[in-house]
């Protein structure tokens, strides 16, 4: 930039002299001798005239005139003189044109210097008006030197105005991408360098390391598939801005148009994960016209259903984030357009006493304001500093600060909602922090804030998998960014760690270093005060029921001196009495803050003072209890009424049971059952009789420790009663989901749900049932199996039972034998007989001595009657989809990464794989969110088989169950039952047509249809037809119709 800056009046006089003064010394002498040097003010009218003159001179056909005009223009450049900037920008396209057209190197160099100095003097917030000229040269100029100069100007702008330029990337990157394919090598190389420079403005740590690869993909599209694979393993946790989308969307668009389905799918997954982190619909709006039609085309044409579901999910995310309504993509925000700012400015200046000024000047001010609006900058200081220098020369009397403030408020108002600030609670702040939270490759919360007050009770609500438990664990483990480390917390989750299962109840409390009471008597008193009996203090925790385990964990948390109680599903397993006890404790605490995760809406209604709700990766606080929250957020009405759930589950059809003609007929029966655990003083259940049919809808209720779970385990064969009889239909299939549902998944956490189901049913039977007590041989069983049968005059013992067939109203079984030699003597021995000597024995003869072997054969026949399902990925995904688990979770996520609710859904799906006739659920409401509870309730209601449920949730069972088994002190009292002998009444069940069957690899087995036997009249008709054909001389065979 020159050292001497000359006023407009002086320059107007100097320009004719500069035309004939070729030497620099002559030029300086003219300037030096001018009496008016720097004495005339830069008023807008003089500036306007000066730059009109310079514009004419620059476009003159006279080379000398152009050079002198450029020299004169260089003299006007002054970074401190803001009022000349609008006119300099107006001349920039002409200056750039001279770089490309001028054949005289001196003039070309002069033009290039002027262009660069214009960039140096510009206000950084004026990038919009500058860029329009620079990018126009790149797009339209046919002169390569002009383009090269434009690229250099972009590099300078990146250094001068990095923040402002980052907002312009969506416009810049497509232009630079096109230039990277220019036929001229110089342009191509410079475009790549400028692209690399521009991309340094992308501030997103998630993709920083991939930017060089993303630039490579623009120049080398063959690298797109590999880059998509690499990005597919990236965890997106940072908020996504327009600059990030500007470099990612071109790659993803190409990925969606690749031929390989896997690349299309991964591109859709990345779009879904990344766009969830876009907070403003206007950020994503410019990219929607490219992405949405492409995804819709893939959805309509792709053959892979799993890929289609991923594409659907991505589409749903784009529609939600982009605020697309009725298929109409919203227009890009126009509030920040310079012409709109100009209109606002003119309306404010109307009626003011102004110096006459051109639209060029006002447009420059509008472009600065437009950039401030783009950045959502509402700071008074920034508006004053960047607008005031340009308004001051043209406003004569009015208060400039007042005008600028009015301009700011009216311009920025479109970004701010008129709604009132959300209500805040009063009191001492425990924490007020901002953080992001992720689990594995999944973003849970993005730059959200958490404010907690002392003594308040907060309900933490959100759907399964949103990250509620992860947030509580992160707080407890001190892993939450910005959370005060000095705060003491206690975390109570769904179950006590297995490592402490052998610890006694007393030691569990006394050995905890965080517990305040250390005196033995104080520990005992505290436990007795909370309803534990003296007998319970010495028993191991593993002997406690689920409800008492939860209560023990809660008592320990209460006895710690903590600031915050973190309760994860605290009402799980608790009966009504203990839920009331917990409510009373929590509401009585004025010093302890509680954060509670629970799907029990009544409990939350009675306890919490505010709801913290997961909404689009943010935590939003609503003051009041659950009922008030529902009124504020009507979309969450399923929290209060599970029947309002909009999602659906479905259980598979159970299939036909041989001999069962109506749904009232008993398919499972218990008579005078008694069971007692080893080491206990009295039976857990006694004198229990019951029966279950296909129409059963049974709720098992009772206080904690009454024996409900024990009763169910005996019914399902998990436990063997010491007295009484348990009978089940030979072909009966029961799905049992235990109270501690996660026990099914314990050793499979590194498998995907699909792999777990494949493992569980790899032999066609349920591997989880192999270790059931009803299938284990005891010493007594082995003694009974030594029974000797007299067959065909020989003494025989049964070696194995292999198959079964119908025998009147029962069955008979094919048995292989050992034949006895010298039976009863010292040298007695038993020799296996060949299979040709197998015999069929009736069920009645075998059941007393070989009941468990008979049961094994019955179970295999039951599996056959259920029809084998292909144990392949697509079938498993389809089955799990019926329980709210999408293919992404089933096939591509490990079990250890699933939430509690998702694990329960998986256990339900896995348990029902064999199409059970009876579903037995022990506390199914634990961990499931409200929508899932509603879906499960409706699915059980429409299920064609029997249902037995243990639950303390009256809300869940009130419209579902008709029969109640009330368990108190080991005694069961049934009510509402309709037990019948024989078939009973009601519609007759018909055996359904056989479904398609498959082998283990999923190949369909074509069943051969049995030839239909012809009637005597049909045989006579066939015979006549043959004789008629023989008369005609045709060759006919009598057996051709057989």
From Swiss-Prot:
<dbReference type="InterPro" id="IPR047038">
    <property type="entry name" value="eEF3_chromodomain-like_sf"/>
</dbReference>
<feature type="repeat" description="HEAT 2">
    <location>
        <begin position="86"/>
        <end position="124"/>
    </location>
</feature>
<dbReference type="GO" id="GO:0003746">
    <property type="term" value="F:translation elongation factor activity"/>
</dbReference>
<dbReference type="InterPro" id="IPR003593">
    <property type="entry name" value="AAA+_ATPase"/>
</dbReference>
<feature type="compositionally biased region" description="Basic residues">
    <location>
        <begin position="1020"/>
        <end position="1031"/>
    </location>
</feature>
<keyword id="KW-0547">Nucleotide-binding</keyword>
<comment type="similarity">
    <text>Belongs to the ABC transporter superfamily. ABCF family. EF3 subfamily.</text>
</comment>
<comment type="subunit">
    <text>Monomer.</text>
</comment>
<keyword id="KW-0963">Cytoplasm</keyword>
<dbReference type="Pfam" id="PF17947">
    <property type="entry name" value="4HB"/>
</dbReference>
<dbReference type="GO" id="GO:0005737">
    <property type="term" value="C:cytoplasm"/>
</dbReference>
<feature type="domain" description="ABC transporter 2">
    <location>
        <begin position="668"/>
        <end position="994"/>
    </location>
</feature>
<dbReference type="InterPro" id="IPR050611">
    <property type="entry name" value="ABCF_EF3_subfamily"/>
</dbReference>
<feature type="repeat" description="HEAT 5">
    <location>
        <begin position="243"/>
        <end position="280"/>
    </location>
</feature>
<dbReference type="InterPro" id="IPR015688">
    <property type="entry name" value="eEF3_ABC2_chromodomain-like"/>
</dbReference>
<dbReference type="Pfam" id="PF24984">
    <property type="entry name" value="HEAT_EF3_GNC1"/>
</dbReference>
<keyword id="KW-0378">Hydrolase</keyword>
<feature type="repeat" description="HEAT 3">
    <location>
        <begin position="167"/>
        <end position="204"/>
    </location>
</feature>
<dbReference type="InterPro" id="IPR003439">
    <property type="entry name" value="ABC_transporter-like_ATP-bd"/>
</dbReference>
<comment type="pathway">
    <text>Protein biosynthesis; polypeptide chain elongation.</text>
</comment>
<comment type="function">
    <text>Ribosome-dependent ATPase that functions in cytoplasmic translation elongation. Required for the ATP-dependent release of deacylated tRNA from the ribosomal E-site during protein biosynthesis. Stimulates the eEF1A-dependent binding of aminoacyl-tRNA to the ribosomal A-site, which has reduced affinity for tRNA as long as the E-site is occupied. Assists translation termination by stimulating the release of nascent protein from the ribosome by release factors.</text>
</comment>
<dbReference type="Pfam" id="PF00005">
    <property type="entry name" value="ABC_tran"/>
</dbReference>
<dbReference type="InterPro" id="IPR027417">
    <property type="entry name" value="P-loop_NTPase"/>
</dbReference>
<feature type="binding site">
    <location>
        <position position="704"/>
    </location>
    <ligand>
        <name>ADP</name>
    </ligand>
</feature>
<dbReference type="InterPro" id="IPR017871">
    <property type="entry name" value="ABC_transporter-like_CS"/>
</dbReference>
<feature type="region of interest" description="Disordered">
    <location>
        <begin position="1009"/>
        <end position="1042"/>
    </location>
</feature>
<dbReference type="InterPro" id="IPR011989">
    <property type="entry name" value="ARM-like"/>
</dbReference>
<dbReference type="InterPro" id="IPR021133">
    <property type="entry name" value="HEAT_type_2"/>
</dbReference>
<keyword id="KW-0648">Protein biosynthesis</keyword>
<feature type="domain" description="ABC transporter 1">
    <location>
        <begin position="425"/>
        <end position="642"/>
    </location>
</feature>
<feature type="repeat" description="HEAT 1">
    <location>
        <begin position="9"/>
        <end position="46"/>
    </location>
</feature>
<dbReference type="GO" id="GO:0005524">
    <property type="term" value="F:ATP binding"/>
</dbReference>
<dbReference type="InterPro" id="IPR040533">
    <property type="entry name" value="EF3_4HB"/>
</dbReference>
<dbReference type="InterPro" id="IPR016024">
    <property type="entry name" value="ARM-type_fold"/>
</dbReference>
<dbReference type="InterPro" id="IPR047036">
    <property type="entry name" value="EF3_4HB_sf"/>
</dbReference>
<keyword id="KW-0251">Elongation factor</keyword>
<feature type="binding site">
    <location>
        <position position="923"/>
    </location>
    <ligand>
        <name>ADP</name>
    </ligand>
</feature>
<feature type="repeat" description="HEAT 6">
    <location>
        <begin position="289"/>
        <end position="327"/>
    </location>
</feature>
<keyword id="KW-0677">Repeat</keyword>
<dbReference type="Pfam" id="PF24987">
    <property type="entry name" value="HEAT_EF3_N"/>
</dbReference>
<dbReference type="GO" id="GO:0003723">
    <property type="term" value="F:RNA binding"/>
</dbReference>
<feature type="repeat" description="HEAT 4">
    <location>
        <begin position="206"/>
        <end position="242"/>
    </location>
</feature>
